[in-house]
Swiss-Prot record:
GO terms for cellular component: nucleus. Signal peptide: none annotated. The gene is Znf24. Residues 251-301 are annotated as: Necessary and sufficient for nuclear localization. Pfam families: SCAN, zf-C2H2. This is Zinc finger protein 24. The lineage of its organism: Eukaryota, Metazoa, Chordata, Craniata, Vertebrata. The modification Phosphotyrosine is found at Y335.
Amino acid sequence: MSAQSVEEDSILIIPNPDEEEKILRVKLEEDPDGEEGSSISWNHLPDPEIFRQRFRQFGYQDSPGPREAVSQLRELCRLWLRPETHTKEQILELVVLEQFVAILPRELQTLVREHHPENGEEAVTVLEDLESELDDPGQPVSLRRRKREVLVEEIASQEDAQGLPSSELDAVENQLKWASWELHSLRHCDDDATAENGALAPKQEIASAGESHEVPGTLNIGVPQIFKYGETCFPKGRFERKRNPSRKKQHICDECGKHFSQGSALILHQRIHSGEKPYGCVECGKAFSRSSILVQHQRVHTGEKPYKCLECGKAFSQNSGLINHQRIHTGEKPYECVQCGKSYSQSSNLFRHQRRHNAEKLLNVVKV
């Protein structure tokens, strides 16, 4: 390869899950209009997750200068979000999905990622299926430890806001800026532990709360609380299941202290800590910690769609997909906006609707 061709290549060092490094050379060439374009074969690129990780882990020291750093970040972001093949809504869902997975407890992050969800709705379905299968769904705090419905209180009503040092005011301003995109995209976790007082429990308190649904604690961000965690945007009872108080739990996890009434449930749970994935797909080699997950995955290869709508005959590979589809026929709209009362059949539609409310709130606060 000539020196000129090397200079025209954009070289990205991408760590794979085994912490090895491989070099992807993205050849840039002139398009017919004289502008630079990419000759990337999108179908043969590695998993977008690799580029997402590299994009987030990229450091300034990884490039010779600021211009090169921006160029590398732009290319990594493009290879992750792939605007050439994804719509704006799909790109939005990828960003929402990333943030949602990031706020999950580490153990749940592992379980969600091995399903390779393509959007937030699929990630939520994974957690719902997990809770319905595990023996101890009565501890939903780990799944719902954060309120996603973020409402911004008027700064003028904060008595202490007038006396804030400039550094804290800057912190407040920065929160307003990034909240308009990052936080308001994920308003879908119903947290019984904070429904009464709107407070956010620290991770340590949540972990020790055990069976309790009332977890004390407040949001500590180093500045006065200008963010208020509002009511849930999910139907009441979501992530909940009635429990049998007489059922004793004699099996205890040595890692986290969680109790189970059946030894089989404990074995499944312990794979979260050990990372064991004994169920492998013979088609593609992917491994999973639970046989039920493997069964769902194999439908990607077989095309099997065992869940059929009795109204129109449309079939789905997962029961959750059928449930969502049936709302078209029944007219059910369980996802309600707590600010205006408008209801939707899909949580993703509610997310988009709430963005409008949150943007208006943020603009009003900035104008104060």
